[in-house]
Swiss-Prot record:
Species per Swiss-Prot/TrEMBL record: Bacillus cytotoxicus (strain DSM 22905 / CIP 110041 / 391-98 / NVH 391-98)
InterPro entries: SspI (IPR017525)
Pfam families linked to this entry: SSPI (PF14098)
Protein's recorded name: Small, acid-soluble spore protein I
UniProt keyword Hydrolase present: no
Disulfide topology: none
Transmembrane segments annotated in the record for this chain: none
Keyword set, alphabetical order: Sporulation
Biological process according to GO: asexual sporulation; sporulation resulting in formation of a cellular spore
HAMAP family (alphabetical): SspI (MF_00669)
Length: 70
């Protein structure tokens, strides 16, 4: 059986408002459940693909700093 996780995540959130998307992200992070990580990865992929070079640079700086503070 082939299961398209990326497609399922995108179908599940298609048409969501910014508030709904934020709630999804916050809930996934606060739950701390490993099973939520692939969905967050799909959301990050959408952000990354739609970001320009400056936004990508800013995200990478934020990520680098966040990892240094762990």
């Amino acid at each position: 059986m082939n299961f398209n996780l990326r497609g399922a995540v995108l179908a599940n959130i298609a048409g969501n408002t910014q508030d709904q998307l934020q709630e999804t992200i916050v809930d996934a992070i606060q739950s701390g459940e490993e099973k939520m990580l692939p969905g967050l990865g799909v959301l990050f992929e959408v952000i990354w693909k739609n970001a320009d070079e400056n936004e990508r640079h800013d995200m990478l700086e934020t990520l680098e700093q966040g990892l240094k503070n762990k």
